[in-house]
């Protein structure tokens, strides 16, 4: 049933926790896990300085590659088929768009991301994906300490 699993990661501990859940599901189902990182370039589009915009974009993409390497390493350790993708734009929209175009069976993501506002938000990205995706979504809660 879950042969094509998409997990969104933002490099946070919450994103890594979601990746672990996705990889466990992939291992159990024999499926392939695709990790996606979306560089939120919408937040930077209003910046007046093109060089600053370019620098921030490059930093976001570098951060994304590092986040995806972490998930890839876990996938190798667990023996799960893995691939990765990077997108730019609004994270919620890009996750849904990628999942639909790639024919994913499920989307997995952390209920909260990097934001410190998690008491106000399910996680704006998670909420957008849950509300708008036609594909089943599994949100992974923050680990309780």
Q: What is each PLM-predicted segment?
A:
Residues 73-107, 145:
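Structural beta-alpha unit
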Residues 53-66:
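A short acidic, glycine-rich active-site loop
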Residues 51, 86-90, 112:
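Short beta->alpha linker loops
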Residues 50-54, 101-103, 125-126:
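Short, hinge-like loop/turn segments at secondary-structure boundaries
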Residues 106-128:
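Glycine-rich, Arg-bearing micro-motifs that act as flexible, cationic patches
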Residues 1-17, 132-145:
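Intrinsically disordered or low-complexity boundary/linker segments at protein termini
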Residues 3-53, 83-85:
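Small/aliphatic-rich secondary-structure junction motif
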């Amino acid at each position: 049933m879950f042969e094509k699993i998409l997990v969104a990661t933002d490099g946070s501990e919450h994103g890594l926790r979601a990746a672990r859940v996705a990889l466990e599901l992939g291992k159990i189902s024999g499926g392939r896990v695709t990790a996606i990182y979306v560089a939120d370039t919408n937040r930077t589009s209003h910046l007046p300085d093109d060089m600053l915009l370019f620098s921030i974009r490059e930093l976001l993409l570098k951060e994304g590659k590092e986040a995806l390497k972490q998930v890839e390493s876990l996938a190798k350790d667990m023996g799960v088929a893995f691939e990765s993708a990077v997108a730019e734009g609004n994270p919620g929209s890009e996750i849904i768009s990628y999942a639909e175009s790639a024919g994913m069976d499920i989307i997995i993501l952390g209920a909260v991301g990097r934001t410190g506002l998690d008491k106000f938000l399910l996680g704006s990205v998670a909420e957008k994906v849950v509300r708008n995706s036609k594909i089943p979504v599994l949100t992974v809660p923050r680990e309780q300490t």
